[in-house]
């Protein structure tokens, strides 16, 4: 009888969720993305979405198949995502200004909320997501033997 591989269920579940995330990056592929204080569409947005979709598919495959490069990709993607979110936090005022200028119900609802509260919620949510990423990277580190069982 073989011993169960620790982390297999968690990593395989994460693999499926990363592939789903890759699909959501592509709908629509040119949706504007916040980079350095501006909302960028067109070719910049397409590259951004394809880059993240590629990372997420790679994570899905690497985690599902327990490849050693999957572990490396978890760490690399955590670093890239962290840098991306930090630039978003640095330029969050510009991003929120863009959100507030949107026509329709979203812009109206956001305009009715105190801007300081919006900034606080935006910052807290971004930091919480980063903590989740780093928590997953730490879990991968603690279960790194999973990636050597191929």
Roles of regions detected by a PLM:
Residues 1-150:
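Topology signature of small-to-medium multi-pass alpha-helical membrane proteins
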């Amino acid at each position: 009888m073989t011993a169960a591989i620790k982390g297999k269920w968690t990593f395989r579940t994460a693999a499926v969720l990363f592939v789903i995330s890759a699909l959501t990056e592509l709908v629509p592929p040119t949706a504007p993305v916040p980079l350095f204080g501006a909302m960028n569409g067109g070719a910049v947005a397409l590259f951004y979405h394809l880059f993240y979709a590629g990372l997420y598919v790679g994570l899905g495959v690497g985690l599902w198949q327990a490849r050693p490069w999957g572990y490396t990709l978890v760490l690399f993607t955590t670093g890239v995502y962290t840098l991306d979110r930090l630039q978003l936090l640095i330029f969050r005022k510009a991003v929120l200004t863009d959100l507030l200028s949107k026509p329709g119900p979203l812009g109206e609802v956001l305009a009715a909320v105190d801007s300081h509260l919006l900034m606080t919620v935006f910052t807290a949510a971004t930091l919480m997501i980063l903590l989740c990423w780093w928590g997953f990277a730490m879990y991968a580190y603690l279960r790194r033997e999973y990636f050597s069982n191929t």
